Amino acid sequence: MLEQVRIQKMVNGGYGLAHLSNGKVVLVEGAYPGEEVLIKTYREKRDFSFGKVVSLLKESEDRIKPPCRYFGRCGGCHWMDVKYETQLRYKKEVLIDLFERSNLKVEVEDVEPSDLVFHYRTKMEFHFQGRKLGLKKRNSDFVIDIKDCEVAPEGTGEILNTVKEAVQVLNVPVYNWETRKGVLKHLVIRYAFSTDQFMVIFVTKTESFPWGRDLVRAVLKRFPKIHSIIHVMNSKDSVVLRGPYKTLYGEGVIVEEFDWERFQIPPTAFFQSNYSITSKLIDHVYREQALQGNEVVLDLYAGIGTFSVRTSFSAARVISVESSRVAVKAGKANANINSRKNIEYVEQDVLDFLKNYSGRADRIILDPPRSGAGPEVMKEIARLSPERIVYVSCDPSTLVRDLKVLVENGYSIVRVKPFDMFPQTYHVETAVTLVKGDR
């Protein structure tokens, strides 16, 4: 069904919201507030539909020509065709809308902009498919073959094309996502901005990878400054960087440095995707704890210690809880590198840890995955009754869900500060500060 609609506002997920002639809500991808578009609805839900733009009838003044030749086909970026300042405004408006619909009365601050709006990513995951090497279409497993990427670090395109050529020359069997046969699945590129270190990661289904040595030679011949080359063995299709790994070349880690600390980042550990925003976020989380020097701090979903290290300079003790063995090992190493003796790492599921923890928790930091912490974790946090909580989230919808539990258990939201971790996309990082009792 074709219908002309006017986009009223942006909503979570990067969609433009409009109403059909029958009053039903329709979410339109690739359309912005004030635009009039001819759409075709393609998926029906009980309360709303999804629509695709067939024709743009009235264009927003905020539209620009995207610099990427793959934009609109590749699913990596969503808002590259609107001005950067407009992207920031949309992200703030989406957050305000979500908080209002959840009956959480807060003031959302302006989104902290990224120093780099292109070539800012610290990690890119590319996928092999037949003779293609690239990024997937949005909501699809179809891979768009690309030669460069506007958000990947400078130099990524050259590495990408060198690997693709070498894979074809060496006749490396590429993994087939339908038959689940073949070997080579992904190419991951990690980059440390402060030290100019590249890590190239080959992800395979199998442990055996006899082509690895020749691929290393091909990459190093053109890029002798590559810091590390890694082979990750991952038989699962759901997550890219998971499973045992071995170092084919180099040290096996890259190092990122900030004002007060430096971090070793291993191949499969999580680390934030934007260097400049991560630096600002570390500062923010540290300040928002208002530490006096005698506090015990729980850092939940601690990763490699991104927030733990800075916090440990002003807290009596930091207990860093993380379920990933690789991240825990790196976190302990990072505590040593930064001469922090008051950080204790616990390798355990966060909920299991909280259920059995009865010690002090004067402050709690949490930075859960996109799925959020969940109501059970939030109830356990409330039970421990910390004076201040700083919740860092990469998904606004799971954030407001979790915050409601804390508010219902006697906490007040005193600050909502968004950070633009992902320019050119609808994603937004948000740090929320809560205090026990009334603000």
Swiss-Prot record:
Residues reported in the UniProt entry to bind S-adenosyl-L-methionine: 272, 301, 322, 367
Binding-site positions, [4Fe-4S] cluster: 68, 74, 77, 149
Residue ranges of every copy of the TRAM domain listed in the record: 1-55
UniProt keyword annotations, A-Z: 4Fe-4S, Iron, Iron-sulfur, Metal-binding, Methyltransferase, S-adenosyl-L-methionine, Transferase
E.C. designation(s): 2.1.1.-
Gene Ontology molecular functions: 4 iron, 4 sulfur cluster binding; metal ion binding; rRNA (uridine-C5-)-methyltransferase activity
Organism domain of life: Bacteria
Catalytic residues, chain numbering: 394 (nucleophile)
Cross-referenced Gene3D superfamilies: 2.40.50.1070, Nucleic acid-binding proteins (2.40.50.140), Vaccinia Virus protein VP39 (3.40.50.150)
One Gene Ontology term from the biological process aspect of the record: rRNA base methylation
NCBIfam families attached to this UniProt entry: rumA (TIGR00479)
Membership in a protein family: Belongs to the class I-like SAM-binding methyltransferase superfamily. RNA M5U methyltransferase family.
PANTHER family xref list: RNA M5U METHYLTRANSFERASE (PTHR11061), TRNA (URACIL(54)-C(5))-METHYLTRANSFERASE (PTHR11061:SF30)
Protein name as it appears in the record: Uncharacterized RNA methyltransferase TM_1094
